[in-house]
Amino acid sequence: ILLLVFMVSAIFFMKNLLMVIFTKLLQTIKSKILLSLLFVISAAFLSAFLDALTVTAVLITVTIGFYQIFEKSYKSNEINKSEFEHGKSFLADIMMHGAVGTALGGVCTIVGEPQNLLIADKAGWEFMEFFYRMAPVTMPVLVSGLICCVLIERFKVFNYGFELSD
């Protein structure tokens, strides 16, 4: 419970910094496929060293912040309903890619997912031994997940592929 309290307070205090970082990313990277891939890779990397739930909580915080910006723009008539709906769909796409990234990265190391701690404890493995022994399974899964992200965005499968208007 104490970990949860620290996690929530850290995210709350870092919200503005995270919003600035992600705003710069959205302004700099124009390709939705590249942006989606960046979110998957970033979430996977962070989840390899932090609990996947913590990384997901950070993604949710940033997504809610952007949603509030879209909502404020819509209510003040700066954007129309269609742009607002596209913005929501864009955020949902990015959020889902980030969530998949946390799962992909979380399975690679001992700290990423809680069940990995149990597996490593029962097998007597340390951090790097867990990584090396699980790599024949986890690395192909990670690569497959990255390829799926690109293909889903490229071919707009399952209503993915929404772009933000300028």
Model-predicted segments: where are they?
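Membrane-embedded alpha-helical segments and adjacent helix-loop junctions characteristic
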Residues: 1-81
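Long, highly hydrophobic alpha-helical transmembrane signal-anchor segments
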Residues: 19, 23-31, 111-125
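Juxtamembrane and boundary regions of transmembrane helices in multi-pass small-molecule transporters
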Residues: 20, 72-98, 107-111, 128-166
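Transmembrane alpha-helix interface/packing and boundary motifs in multi-pass membrane proteins
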Residues: 42-52, 99-111
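Re-entrant/interfacial helical elements at transmembrane boundaries that shape
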Residues: 54-68, 108-123
